[in-house]
Amino acid sequence: MALPRPVQYGKVQRMSYGKVKEVLDLPYLLEIQKKSFQWFLDEGLREVLREISPIKDYSETLLLEFVDYYFDGPPKYSEQECKERDATYARPLKVKVRLINKETGEIKEQDIYMGEFPIMTETGTFIINGAERVIVSQLIRSPGCYFASSIDKQGRKIFSGTLIPNRGAWLEFETDASELLSVRLDRTRKVSLTTLLKAFGLYNQQLIFEKFGEDERLKASLEKEANKGELGNPVENALLEVYRRLRPGEPPNVENARNLLYSMFFDPRRYDLAKVGRYKFNKKLSLWKRIFNKRAAQDVVDPKTGEILVKEGELITREIATQIQDAGVNEVWVYADEERPFKVVGNNTVKLDRYVEFDVSDINIKELVYRPVLDDILNTTNDVLEIKRLIKERERELVPYCLTIDDIFAATSYFLGLKYGIGTTDDIDHLGNRRVRAVGELLQNQFRIGLARMERVIRERMNIHDIDTVTPQTLINIRPVTAAIKEFFGSSPLSQFMDQVNPLAALTNKRRLSALGPGGLSRDRAGFEVRDVHHSHYGRMCPIETPEGPNIGLITSLATYARVNEYGFLETPYRKVDKKEARVTNEVVYLTADEEDTYKIAQATEPVDEEGRFINQRVTVRFGEEIIEVDKHEVDLIDISPKQIVSVSTSLIPFLENDDANRALMGSNMQRQAVPLLMTESPIIGTGVEYRAAVDSGVCILAKKDGVVENVSADEIVIRNNDGTKDVYHLLKFKRTNQGTCFNQRPIVRKGQEVKAGEVIADGPSTDHGELALGKNVLVAFMPWEGYNYEDAILISERLVKEDVYTSIHIEEYECEARDTKLGPEEITRDIPNVGEDAIKDLDERGIIRIGAEVKSGDILVGKVTPKGETELTAEERLLRAIFGEKARETRDTSLRVPHGEGGIVVDVKVFSRDKGDELPPGVNQLVRVYVAQKRKISVGDKMAGRHGNKGVISRILPVEDMPFLPDGTPVDIVLNPLGVPSRMNIGQILETHLGYAAKALGWKVATPVFDGAKEEDIEEALKLAGLNPTGKTILYDGRTGEPFDNEVTVGYMYMLKLVHLVDDKIHARSTGPYSLVTQQPLGGKAQFGGQRFGEMEVWALEAYGAAYTLQELLTVKSDDVTGRVKTYEAIVKGENIPEPGIPESFKVLVKELQSLCLDVKLLSEDNKEIELKESVDEDEQPQGLGAFEIGGDEIEEDKEDDKEKFYEDLMNATQEDDQGEIDDIDE
């Protein structure tokens, strides 16, 4: 066996087991975001402004044109400042506007400020109101022309078709049970197909048959209409009929009907196919695709030269078919299956370069062009320059983005031909029919909505304003535009709060594809077909990485090599194969899903010799959705790399090929939840993608140019470049991420070191020398240990705690704002009423905690007082106050305290105040932010996982001396349950363990790429080389007794991650706390500081044991017996017996609900006396009882803990004074 070869990944050398020669490096992983936003800035904005201008008033005297746009100056704040100040990272957008007065010929030009436009950061994110957000790309149905077939009750095939625009009305073709053809316009009522054709000018049977050939279905439809016996002009009758269907209840007239049809399908403002729609229409409806491989039923003659292109009865090859189309022939008779001729009608589009003499590459028209317009241009002039100018001028007519009459005829012809096997039906889940809308396009659509709203305002203003004094500035109101953009970034479901747990999570978030969102699918309506893995996903979308749960299959990830083309379709690269020699070339082609279906494609791992010739005579290839074996000379293409089918997350799993897909899915998802650790360590067993994933995620700092390090400190690196310039790189230290993990960068270069451009000079979170390092390499043993690893639990050694192996830093942010209230402004101060000196010892003179202080739950972070409502003053008091000045006003303590269960070290304090000129929300005078950091060691209850979906919860931390140890005395770090492997079928973890053991002994770092990694024999070889047992098993000794265990145990190094599901964030306890307003039961959940729900089934359990008193107090004094719980609290404080429970509040609510249904419900005692149901205490004074149990209620109460202490006293006094033990309504 050959040894692995050393490969350099950045600064790290790994021994790679990969055998496939990679011609193409991984592309830049954030390209989809960056490229799309750049397109928007360069082209997208211009397109929208061009679409909307000119805006005319109703009399067409004023014209408003948007000429140009530019970004004026840099962003106001840097990215870091924006995060601190809750600002948006944006640049001012200016648009050059021209106002033309047609009557006087006067032209006014102005540069108009169109608001602050959010700008993408270097790492593909946006900062909106201080929060880092990502715009997820959307996967939607592409506009185009789709046909489908279904089987009806009689077992006949029924065809249907739909013309779907980017925006505008749908046109649907349908066949009903009696084979009558009908059309649905914009999802309204059906119209007969022939009626629509008449409305479009084919007004009698002869014209229709001339156009489409004779067809029984058309005949039947025409006969049915003839029986109606309408008089008058057939075109007008048809128009009126269509209008009646579309606008039932309105009086029809021919003019309105004509306008309606025009505006529905032929008005560029109302109907838009977009570039991609036109491309798909031409692809589907052009002639050649339907006639090739058919026999001609008549001679086909070139209309220009008169030569016969194909004779009757001849087979039309691909070449002849394209020749026919380019010659401008739009109608061809071919033989359908049963020797019957059928007329195929195209949509009258041709290739531009066949008709003009010059090179068309410089006019930027790649699509087929509409023939009638082209003929019109060519007939006006012969001058080449003039033709060029006309083509540029009439580009929107040559390549129309709305329907043409020929499109509708071609679609009708296609629809008719399906019955005879001419044309194909479409699979809507095929990636050739789904496209990606990335940031740029989503923003463009939003901008378009804003401009359309603005246009309405401008039109109205044009009519109101005086024509002579009007300027562009007075006409334009930018509010609709800025509002549309703000709304998109703030509340669109596709604008997501960035997942920043670790660099991989951030990278994946930016490479997401979501089928949800506006214009997409909804979770409830999406069936299995949409969610399924499709053969066209190969190399474009990852079949593994998708969430578990309701979104499975709707949210996916971009494959490693995939890219989005100009139409929004996903493309993946292949290497070309020289068919004659059966030799793989280095030429790379990118193909979309529908182009790929016609080729035979071999696997990247197919063995080839030095020259690249296939070794095997028969080669396994993919062909459409089939996998077949063909002769080596038939292969067209070969995959570029084995990892091209999976996403970045998945390509980080070594031995992926040995894992079950379901577990690999969990592995991919859990890597994104790994917490950045204090000390990072890259995996011994990697896949070679770690370096690129870390560098492209943008958390590392790369040198911009070659040079020498001049100075290094913890937070900046100075490099003197070889070209004489100097670069200073600032590092981020201990910043809080969106998820509360810690973002910290540290330099990895020394003073005087030479660096190359693009070299990693500083590591970020979860990276180690420029490689992704999400977890730690630990020594694991697979064996049961006293039942502590039952059901996936994990037993760990105390060494991992002591040596901070799995310690992570978490930073929480607390904020406190001083506002203006009705009674006066709140004040941030050290002088807090009723608080001892001990509580404020760590506050500075302003009343803000000092940096470095250690705080526990309940400690004051920011002292704040709020003015209290004053009582009416007596005359004497008023007099005294007038003489001696203002007496200290009553204030109450509303300080910011550390929440229950939190705490740590204060690492940073930021103070913003209106006086210093900081921008604050209205009504806020001061804002203080306190950052508290915690060092969290690994503890019982934390969740850990490997990279293969092997997850578990820590059940016990054993002293090192009790852990099982190896013959040389090394104790293992983790003991895992061997029963977690066989049924889960993730054998990758075992291979990783074995190879890790060998690699650690040899001092290697290994790269074993997915689907091209180390085989079993390679691992055996490495174990032998390291002088270890080739089975990978070892005798282990019990740490408690020193005896060897009965059997040999699998031991080795595995890469284990600590996940973000930490026990500290989940554990929760409550004695008293907030109550729901209506039912008076405790709230639920940690966030509300709620109680434990004692539900229906738990009640049954206690009933089954007859535990009546336990049950009684659970349902009353521990929950919603308002008076009882106060008395109980009092009794416990005084050490008395607990009193009798009263009536639960929820019973009173039930009685009230019954009374509201007009049922007279009374509560009677044993001797038929009515029991008064006292109303519960006034809303403002919420009594706080014991209540730690919630029996139902889920309403959340607003904080009403104004003056708890005083209220307790009042309540207690009232209770003692009252003999009956009932509390009367207390009014303070």
UniProtKB/Swiss-Prot annotation:
Classification via SUPFAM superfamilies: beta and beta-prime subunits of DNA dependent RNA-polymerase (SSF64484)
Protein keywords: DNA-directed RNA polymerase, Nucleotidyltransferase, Transcription, Transferase
Catalytic activities: RNA(n) + a ribonucleoside 5'-triphosphate = RNA(n+1) + diphosphate
Binding partners and assembly: The RNAP catalytic core consists of 2 alpha, 1 beta, 1 beta' and 1 omega subunit. When a sigma factor is associated with the core the holoenzyme is formed, which can initiate transcription.
General function of this protein: DNA-dependent RNA polymerase catalyzes the transcription of DNA into RNA using the four ribonucleoside triphosphates as substrates.
Record's GO cellular component terms: DNA-directed RNA polymerase complex
This enzyme's EC code(s): 2.7.7.6
Compositionally biased region (Acidic residues): 1192-1202
Organism whose genome encodes this protein: Caldicellulosiruptor bescii (strain ATCC BAA-1888 / DSM 6725 / KCTC 15123 / Z-1320) (Anaerocellum thermophilum)
Top-rank taxon, per record: Bacteria
Gene: rpoB
Protein family: Belongs to the RNA polymerase beta chain family.
HAMAP family: RNApol_bact_RpoB (MF_01321)
GO biological process: DNA-templated transcription
UniProt name for this protein: DNA-directed RNA polymerase subunit beta
Lineage, broadest ranks: Bacteria, Bacillati, Bacillota, Bacillota incertae sedis, Caldicellulosiruptorales
Annotated Pfam families: RNA_pol_Rpb2_1, RNA_pol_Rpb2_2, RNA_pol_Rpb2_3, RNA_pol_Rpb2_45, RNA_pol_Rpb2_6, RNA_pol_Rpb2_7
Gene3D superfamilies, A to Z: 2.40.50.100, 2.40.50.150, 3.90.1100.10, DNA-directed RNA polymerase, beta subunit, external 1 domain (2.30.150.10), DNA-directed RNA polymerase, subunit 2, domain 6 (2.40.270.10), RNA polymerase alpha subunit dimerisation domain (3.90.1800.10), RNA polymerase Rpb2, domain 2 (3.90.1110.10)
